A protein has these predicted regions:
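Generic hydrophobic secondary-structure packing signal
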Residues: 23, 79-80, 99
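Short linear sequence motifs
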Residues: 51-54, 71, 85, 95
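Detector for Asparagine
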Residues: 41, 45-47, 77, 98, ...
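Activation targets extended, charge/polar-rich intrinsically disordered C-terminal tails
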Residues: 83-132
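Histidine-anchored, small-residue-rich loop motif
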Residues: 59-89
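Glycine-rich catalytic cores of cysteine/serine-nucleophile enzymes that process amide/ester linkages
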Residues: 4-69
């Protein structure tokens, strides 16, 4: 059995970033009973509304990526579609709307990014070291 066959709606897939080290990328699985796709927010995406949230086949999403981990959540197809409709015109932004913001808005109901917070702490540490 292939991994994609074991995925269910709401599974959050953490993968490597394409061409960038020291980061990860998130997508969330949508299963309509006929096919499984992955919704995600990427600076390389452009949907028909000009935003950066797109739905792709699992195979397309996984091109040039490696799975880091998969987390099962209680997010439903409705949750995914509702959040995607609300932000359909928004463009990926590393500070305000990255892949983690998008997926965690679906799963938790609000935006947040652990990766961005880690980079902020690292930048603050560098500034403090330089100031000393």
């Amino acid at each position: 059995m292939k991994l994609v066959d074991r995925l269910t709606t709401g599974d959050v897939i953490y993968t490597s970033c394409v061409g960038i080290h020291l980061c990860y990328h998130l997508g969330i699985v949508y299963d309509d009973g006929k096919k499984k796709t992955v919704y995600h927010n990427s600076p390389y995406n452009k949907n028909k509304y000009g935003g950066s949230v797109c739905e792709e086949s699992y195979e397309t999403f996984m091109k040039e990526r490696e799975i880091m981990k998969i987390i099962r959540t209680s997010a439903t197809n409705y949750d995914i579609l509702d959040a995607s409709r609300k932000c359909k015109t928004e463009i990926w932004d590393s500070f305000f709307f990255n892949c983690e913001d998008y997926v965690l808005e679906i799963v938790e109901g609000h935006r947040r990014s652990n990766l961005r917070d880690s980079w902020k702490i690292a930048a603050l540490g560098i500034v403090i070291l330089i100031a000393l």
